[in-house]
Amino acid sequence: LNTEAFRHADKPLEYSLAAIRKQGYRYCELNMLNGRDLLCEAGYYGAVSMERDPLEVKAIVDSFGLKVSAVSAHAPMAQPEISIPFLTRAIEYADALGATCVCTDEGVVPAWMSKKQAFNIIYYTLRRVLPVAERHKIHIGLEPHQKYSVKLNTYLELLNLVESPYMSCNPDTGNIFMAGQDPYEFLEAIAKRIVHVHAKDIGGVVMGDRGKVTGVPSGCACGEGVLDWQRIVKILRKAKFKGVLSVECSSEEQGRASIKHLRKVLKAK
């Protein structure tokens, strides 16, 4: 379960981890930030500063009987002065935590930048970042979440900009749907390179924005929206996916409902 499901103004990381474990999840996905933040340090919310000792954070996660599936480290790849140091540190941090993946996307591309210009800069960013990923054996999980990555053809272009066994896929089922794409076709096209999945369902008021947005931060409980989880799991199993379904939802209640539904789906043949 992604820790973004816990949206409180007065709860530290430990609160989220305790709730995740109590709900029956075995893995958590942590949200990373750089620099120091007083509110975070004081325990008002559960993001993790990458200036903190990662082994200290790992010990905290371990104490709740959890493992870290991935770190969420979205960075604007078309702005290498930001994304290269941020993603480099996220890779190092993920390795220390025992995670296998850094989840990110291409970020918001400035309106004045053409696609060709953006892809040239993103290529440079990836050429700098992927050698670090290869040394640490951490996957860069490209997530569909911005204007290029939410469309299958340009997602594949981004995915193949730099050849590396650690340039991989972290599909977000809800974002793909909200962008007006076919999530099942999308998954089938990238299935062999999927290392981590954002399990996000979509329903309710956001449905009216389909085709107008590049995704949503979080969805409804898995099984309470429009996505066919049996079909999604079938695609993943056919590709011999062995990674983690990291639920992204909007509340603790949705987290409980999601794991209940997904367990039923996973137990079915």
Task: Go through the PLM ranges and name each one.
Residues 5, 47-48, 72-81, 220-223:
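The substrate-binding groove and active-site-proximal loops of carbohydrate-active enzymes
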Residues 2-26, 62-64, 98, 149-269:
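Histidine-acidic metal/acid-base catalytic patches
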Residues 39-43, 81-83, 114-117, 153-155, ...:
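Short secondary-structure transition/capping segments
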Residues 15, 21, 55-56, 60-67, ...:
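Active-site acidic/histidine proton-transfer and metal-coordination neighborhood
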Residues 38-45, 74, 107, 210-217:
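Vicinal oxygen chelate
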Residues 30-35, 73, 106-107, 145, ...:
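Active-site loop/turn elements of alpha/beta-hydrolase fold enzymes
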Residues 29, 70, 103, 141, ...:
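Conserved beta-strand positions in the central sheet of alpha/beta enzyme cores
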Residues 29-56, 109-114:
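Glycine-rich, proline-tolerant flexible connector loops at the mouths of alpha/beta enzymes
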